[in-house]
Amino acid sequence: MSFFAILYMLATYFLGSISSAILICRLVGLPDPRQSGSGNPGATNVLRIGGRWAALAVLIFDILKGMIPVWCGYYLGLTPFELGMVALSACLGHIFPIYFKFRGGKGVATAFGAIAPISWGIAGAMLGTWGIIFLLSGYSSLSAVIAALVTPFYVWWIRPEFTFPVALVCCLLVYRHHENIQRLWRGQEDKVWAKFKKKEDSQGE
């Protein structure tokens, strides 16, 4: 691995550490996502605490902070392994942000953004898997875990030279969801739209 690639990975980590969920919630007057809803500073939790447009802004920002470094690294001539490490650095920054006491999000949107420049086909398969599981179950966490588990196989089939680094990213995503997996096993995980259903029920009373 080149010295330039190592410096680039560090810069990517610092970029990934910018938590859009925390900053945007502060900007629009929403509660701190680390203290509300699921406690996760990510787009899904921002949606839970009532900010649809804020959640969309968070989602776009988190995707871009994974996508832009990998895309630029590709044109700067980084090797597939180095690009994979850049993707991992972006996710590590999002999950363990240095600016916010290393308490970050789950990394799904950032991982999607980082994988997209490798292959739009892989990104589409990843998104399609997430969407199908979400529509069938209503659980964002379950959708993310299953998408993370199958994405390395998509990569192996389409762009095999990226299989190992992408598998590392996906393992990180699964690890980051270990608490969600436990709640799913116990039947205690909330569906994304559960909050909105409760709100509608309370308004109808």
Swiss-Prot record:
Record's protein name: Glycerol-3-phosphate acyltransferase
InterPro entries per record: G3P_acylTferase_PlsY
One record GO biological process: phospholipid biosynthetic process
Family: Belongs to the PlsY family.
Compartments, record wording: Cell inner membrane
Free-text function comment from the UniProt entry: Catalyzes the transfer of an acyl group from acyl-phosphate (acyl-PO(4)) to glycerol-3-phosphate (G3P) to form lysophosphatidic acid (LPA). This enzyme utilizes acyl-phosphate as fatty acyl donor, but not acyl-CoA or acyl-ACP.
Domain of life: Bacteria
Encoding gene, per UniProt annotation: plsY
Keywords, in A-Z order: Cell inner membrane, Cell membrane, Lipid biosynthesis, Lipid metabolism, Membrane, Phospholipid biosynthesis, Phospholipid metabolism, Transferase, Transmembrane, Transmembrane helix
Organism for this UniProt entry: Mannheimia succiniciproducens (strain KCTC 0769BP / MBEL55E)
Known pathway: Lipid metabolism; phospholipid metabolism
Signal peptide: none
